[in-house]
Amino acid sequence: MKYIYLDNASTTFPKAPTVASAMSDYITNRGININRGSYALAYDVEDIIYTTRQRLNSLFNGHDPSHVFFTQNVTMSLNMVIKGLFKAGDHVLISSMEHNAVMRPLTQLLNEDITFDTIPCDTTGSIKLDAIESLIRPNTVAIIINHASNVCGTIQPVKEIGIICKEHNLHFIVDAAQTAGIMPIDVKESQIDALCFTGHKGLLGPQGIGGMILTKEMAQALTPLIAGGTGSFSHLETMPTNMPDAFESGTLNLPCIIGLNEGLAFIESKGMENIHNHELALTEAFLKGLRPIDGINIIGKQNVQDRTAVVSITIDGADAASVAYELESTYHIMTRVGLHCAPRAHQTLGTYPEGTVRFSFGYANTHKDVESALSALHKIVKNTKSVSYTHLR
């Protein structure tokens, strides 16, 4: 039985072709630690880890590979920045499209006299740029923005927001969970102080690895969330300040970093623009096929230029969870349903509390997958109308 995987916004599947073999080779043949052993095999693995930092720094046009830090995921990265930067009395601005990876740590900090206000977005998820300056207070220290919505794919204008941040001397923190490896991100051009990303989505690596790219100023301003052994300055009982050690305590997830390196190599070989154009072509075909179907509501932007390859829908008269269940059980199509860990985004989009059915395309999907999804939706809508008509009679 062939399944069609359309949940790439959750995690890309399949991964880049050499990810699994590279991870297996490391575990089987070179499964040693780095920054600990003074032997050749350790140095060989260190070279791979450094190459991965270089690739990430180049991809995002960061300031220095030493300021590329590995974490377990984007949620950890955001927590490290949010909980390491803000102090009592600070005020933060966020958008109304933020994920719980931002909302929950910020809500925890309310108990520490750290407050936040929400920059409104319209019903397509686009931030209202002209509303930002009126929300800035004397004690505002940062703006945190979800680069692209995991609910509807709407892309925010990070370059313009970065300009506003610099004009008001604010830190600019970007959640790039849905855009890293998918579309160009220029840390310098967009004046981003902290870019938080995950490795298992657009970067085509395994689950369990993420990271953050910091400016030198941001790295100096942060208090490390986790302290421990680094393999350097071991005579000190305080954390070293050299980078990247200051934010990488304990044993790194070396198998997953090596897998991420393979994902990055695949993106380099295929070309990120080529992968992105393929995914957007699938998205455009899907949107074109959805528009004539009476009863289907497309959430967010109506064109591909302003969105990622993520499409959320609702169906008149049909429960979202039931639609997703039928897609999987009858048509073997895997999607994501519900609130997507982003209730504020759904409130903004008008889809709270039920949520949506989300389709998200990846590099391995085909136009045949799109056709299968559209065919299934046609049948589901037809059946929904038939049931509704029978009920009315």
Where are these regions (language model features)?
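Conserved small/polar residues in nucleotide/adenosyl-binding loops
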Residues: 390-393
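Pyridoxal 5′-phosphate
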Residues: 1-388
